[in-house]
């Protein structure tokens, strides 16, 4: 059930001063094994009065094998000296050449096979932003990491360096199987305001819990808010052992790097013009995320504390920034009808002076294309009443109506007079 691991470098060094061709040599080897310390292999060997010869090194192949041939009879120290990122190495160990055949105690095995087991720590990262619409809304990132199959675990931490466009809000840490862990006792959460990095590090007590529950996973949820537009990429680092803490990401023996996830934010630019194409100013717009809200003018989008956006530029342009991409949610592309897809509605709540208010909302989307420089939407207004001055607003038309009214009244009077005369 084990998976071969290529790319692991092993070094083999003979312990000098122990002669395994004699019974006393085997006794000395047994004594050394009793005091051998995997945490300090060289020190425990030299402390027992022995030395180590120059070593030879090999890297495991695609089958996870490294074969050291031609070794003389003796006791050897075997260590992993290099291994892929995200891998917790097996502890150093002593092995003798030859070994007693476990199936035939009267026989020696000179072809020795050992199977050191490495712990591979994999990790994933996801983003949840489908419910986010405008800058200031919450976007959450979830890091899920395996636990090293090692005991003891000498170090374990997760670091998420947040993009400057993200503001840290809070973080929680749990084990996927529900095993209880407590902040402060089993782990710490530190947010560095200078680097915007969030670090979750397990204490000795917490690492003991991890070692005892290494078939579950560590889950870190980080809540942020978005403060600026952009395609904001994010990934996390999982350091599976103490040695990995001092190794750069991507280097052998370094941390596991999660896949990168993104949350994408942008805007659009509107050009306000009259029927002849001349730029207009003074229009005021609101933005909504549903047709019902747009019709009722309820729940408008709020950006930088404003729910209304006025065209003040002389060229009639208005840029509305700070909206999530319509076609990208929860780290993936979405299409109309998919969960997380955003259809926006632009509603004119004040028309330019002398122009009619738009009769209906205008649908629009926010994408990488609309966020790029340039005009994305041209909105045309028509003059009041199509340019014709209605009565009571001044001009010749009013005078005509007044005269017609007088004529009607006069005609009425004549009619009455005539009628009365006829009845006289």
Model-derived features with residue positions:
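Solvent-exposed loop/turn and edge beta-strand elements of beta-rich ligand-binding domains
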Residues: 1-424
């Amino acid at each position: 059930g084990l998976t071969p691991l290529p790319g692991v470098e092993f070094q083999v060094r003979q312990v000098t001063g122990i002669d395994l061709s004699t019974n006393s040599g085997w006794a000395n080897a047994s004594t050394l094994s009793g005091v051998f310390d995997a945490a300090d292999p060289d020190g425990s060997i030299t402390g027992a009065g022995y030395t180590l010869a120059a070593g030879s090194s090999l890297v495991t192949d695609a089958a996870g094998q490294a074969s050291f041939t031609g070794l003389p009879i003796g006791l050897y120290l075997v260590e992993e000296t290099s291994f892929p990122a995200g891998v917790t190495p097996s502890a150093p160990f002593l092995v003798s050449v030859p070994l007693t055949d476990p199936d035939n105690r009267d026989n020696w095995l000179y072809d020795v096979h050992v199977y050191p087991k490495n712990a591979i720590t994999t990790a994933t990262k996801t983003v949840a932003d489908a419910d986010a619409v405008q800058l200031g809304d919450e976007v959450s990132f979830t890091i899920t990491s395996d636990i090293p199959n090692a005991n003891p675990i000498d170090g374990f931490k997760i670091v998420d360096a947040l993009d400057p466009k993200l503001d840290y809000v809070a973080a929680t840490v749990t084990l996927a199987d529900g095993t209880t862990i407590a902040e402060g006792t089993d782990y710490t959460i530190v947010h560095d305001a200078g680097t915007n990095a969030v670090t979750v590090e397990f204490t000795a007590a917490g690492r003991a819990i991890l070692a005892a529950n290494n078939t579950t996973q560590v889950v870190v949820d980080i809540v942020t808010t978005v403060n600026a537009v952009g395609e904001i990429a994010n990934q996390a680092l999982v350091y599976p052992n103490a040695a990995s803490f001092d190794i750069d990401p991507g280097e052998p023996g370094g941390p596991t790097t999660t896949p990168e996830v993104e949350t994408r934010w942008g805007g659009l630019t509107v050009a306000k013009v009259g029927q002849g194409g001349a730029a207009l100013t003074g229009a005021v717009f609101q933005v909504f995320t549903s047709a019902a809200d747009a019709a009722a003018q309820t729940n408008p989008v709020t950006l930088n504390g404003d729910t209304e956006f006025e065209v003040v530029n002389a060229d009639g342009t208005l840029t509305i920034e700070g909206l999530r991409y319509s076609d990208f949610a929860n780290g993936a592309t979405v299409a109309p009808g998919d969960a997380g897809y955003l259809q926006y509605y632009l509603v004119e709540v004040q028309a330019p002076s002398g122009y009619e208010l738009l009769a209906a909302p205008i649908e629009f989307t926010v994408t990488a294309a609309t966020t790029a420089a340039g005009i994305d939407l041209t909105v045309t207004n028509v003059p009041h009443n199509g340019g014709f001055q209605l009565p009571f607003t001044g001009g010749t038309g009013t005078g005509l109506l007044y005269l017609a009214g007088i004529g009607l009244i006069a005609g009425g009077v004549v009619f009455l007079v005539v009628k009365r005369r006829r009845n006289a």
